[in-house]
Amino acid sequence: MDTSGHFHDSGVGDLDEDPKCPCPSSGDEQQQQQPPPPPPPPAPPAAPQQPPGPPLQPQPLQLQQQQQQQQQQPPHPLSQLAQLQSQPVHPGLLHSSPTAFRAPPSSNSTAILHPSSRQGSQLNLNDHLLGHSPSSTATSGPGGGGRHRQASPLVHRRDSNPFTEIAMSSCKYSGGVMKPLSRLSASRRNLIEAEPEGQPLQLFSPSNPPEIIISSREDNHAHQTLLHHPNATHNHQHAGTTASSTTFPKANKRKNQNIGYKLGHRRALFEKRKRLSDYALIFGMFGIVVMVIETELSWGLYSKDSMFSLALKCLISLSTIILLGLIIAYHTREVQLFVIDNGADDWRIAMTYERILYISLEMLVCAIHPIPGEYKFFWTARLAFSYTPSRAEADVDIILSIPMFLRLYLIARVMLLHSKLFTDASSRSIGALNKINFNTRFVMKTLMTICPGTVLLVFSISLWIIAAWTVRVCERYHDQQDVTSNFLGAMWLISITFLSIGYGDMVPHTYCGKGVCLLTGIMGAGCTALVVAVVARKLELTKAEKHVHNFMMDTQLTKRIKNAAANVLRETWLIYKHTKLLKKIDHAKVRKHQRKFLQAIHQLRSVKMEQRKLSDQANTLVDLSKMQNVMYDLITELNDRSEDLEKQIGSLESKLEHLTASFNSLPLLIADTLRQQQQQLLSALMEARGVSVAVGTTHTPLSDSPIGVSSTSFPTPYTSSSSC
């Protein structure tokens, strides 16, 4: 075996190792070399072990002789091939590295590779397979002159050779051949592919033979491409496969990623996406804070052309650039998650028009910021009460500073990614089963359900402060009386607009201030409706409180019904008393009791109507758990009754079986009774016969029976009625 990983033929089944493997380049050099002695003929199976011969140099004449001998050689017996199953397999030779089968040129390794060095076998299985595999042999051109065999650990399965199939199947089922590399798990294949190509040299020994692996042709082709790609001495043979050999590892690595790797990679992407969102929010809020500081300081302390303003604007620009990079990285993680979740091969599949538009809009919103430098424009407005036009020179930074508050949408993203409902696996699984989309809207709904007051308070205060500062910035160039340009005055204007009061003592002058007030009024109307809903929910009775209230009302109505019924009976008795029992009828008292009687009847009817309404209201309060308990009680009672019925039916069946057995035994009892009576009668007749004989009376027998009585005269259970 040479350093390039090739075996050279030196005979039938012989492998010769030469570290240099010289190849004659011309006919003169081939004639100068002396031909080696002819190879020894193959020994029979029972021949003793022979020492290995000296290393031979491959010559053209010798190669022709070897080919003729190999064609004339009979097939080897299968008993020689089956003995390889008892040889141990070294686990480290499973790698597909080209150096895994290299061995130093020593006598021990040569003797081991020689087929006659093993007891009881004349042919190595690896040599036999390589000799019968046309895909592993290559004949060089006329200038090369030599036939070499590739030393690959993977051996092709030949369907046309029945001996190879029988030997391989025998070794496979007996444990002599390991499973192919293509059938390994994806994790082991990833580990094999991840290992470097440079493996330590493995020495061949009787206790450590090379492993033979049976695999498919596709795997052999891929691994042979990987084996021959690093060898510089075979670049002229594999020039066409160099480009394809670089693509095979990537394709195999992508295909061999199992579900465990994908889940781990997906979890890592989730964590990276959350950290990127946090960093983006930090830099976005930092830019807003620096923008507010720069705007306030440039209005009161220094001008826009100072170094302090330039430094703060440069800081804002730097934070904006970092923010844009974080947003790009965030959406990159989003695309990677889409590829993993949907099993896509190309990331461009995830880049839909909607996603591209969303990313572009987000980049545009986050890219707006004050540009370093001093830029001004003339701003014309009309004053509110005097309706006179006002023209002032304003900074362009106002137009670029106010849209920076749109970066606050990052807060909703961070809330979503940090929510327990979004990060918890159990909640995500339950939501997926119920077809719930975990987005920002769902998280806000849960927050409004859990703590509605806190959410509304934080939202209202934040909107109040931001809108007041925006109105102050918009109105300070045209407010000569310092009314709306004052921060406290702007807060008063926003508050009365938010609550939809509108006193009219303060009004904005510019369209910028009017637009902010319009948005504030819309937000105020929505927040007011939410506050009313939250207050109504807080004032509403709970289910337990409603049950208690209904119980108390039912008790009071029951008492009122009893009182009304008692009043009806009382007035009925009094009417009967004054009309029937008294001698002199007092019509005034009768009419009085009749009025009270009618009032009692109407009161009884009204109380019953209230009780009916209360019962209807109570029926609507029956929740699912109570209904479930009632149904459970009913089902339990039905089960108990069915069990009792089954017990009764079982007792009846046992009694019927007892009666049936009694009726079946009745004929036997009757037969036994009749038999006993017949025996008693016969015994009585025998006694009477004995007494008559003793007296000396001559008796003529009536029949052939010894007692003179025919047996047919006495019926038995087995005789018919006609014989009696």
From Swiss-Prot:
Keywords of the record: Calmodulin-binding, Cell membrane, Coiled coil, Cytoplasm, Ion channel, Ion transport, Membrane, Phosphoprotein, Transmembrane, Transmembrane helix, Transport
Composition bias, Pro residues: 34-58
GO BP annotations, alphabetical order: potassium ion transmembrane transport
Sequence ranges marked intramembrane in UniProt: 487-507
Bias type Basic and acidic residues, positions: 1-11
One cellular component term from this protein's GO annotations in UniProt: neuronal cell body
Modified residues (Phosphoserine): S160
Coiled-coil positions: 635-662
Subcellular location field: Cell membrane; Cytoplasm, Myofibril, Sarcomere, Z line
Membrane topology designation: Multi-pass membrane protein
Activity regulation info: Inhibited by bee venom neurotoxin apamin.
Stretches with biased composition (Polar residues): 105-125, 232-249
Domain of life: Eukaryota
Catalytic activity: K(+)(in) = K(+)(out)
InterPro entries xref list: CaM-bd_dom, CaM-bd_dom_sf, K_chnl_Ca-activ_SK, K_chnl_dom
Gene3D superfamilies cross-referenced by the UniProt entry: 1.10.287.70
Keyword Cytoplasm: yes
Chain segments carrying region Calmodulin-binding: 554-630
Main function: Small conductance calcium-activated potassium channel that mediates the voltage-independent transmembrane transfer of potassium across the cell membrane through a constitutive interaction with calmodulin which binds the intracellular calcium allowing its opening. The current is characterized by a voltage-independent activation, an intracellular calcium concentration increase-dependent activation and a single-channel conductance of 10 picosiemens.
Domain remarks in the Swiss-Prot or TrEMBL record: The coiled-coil domaim mediates heteromeic assembly.
Similarity remark: Belongs to the potassium channel KCNN family. KCa2.3/KCNN3 subfamily.
Protein name: Small conductance calcium-activated potassium channel protein 3
Organism: Sus scrofa (Pig)
Protein's gene: KCNN3
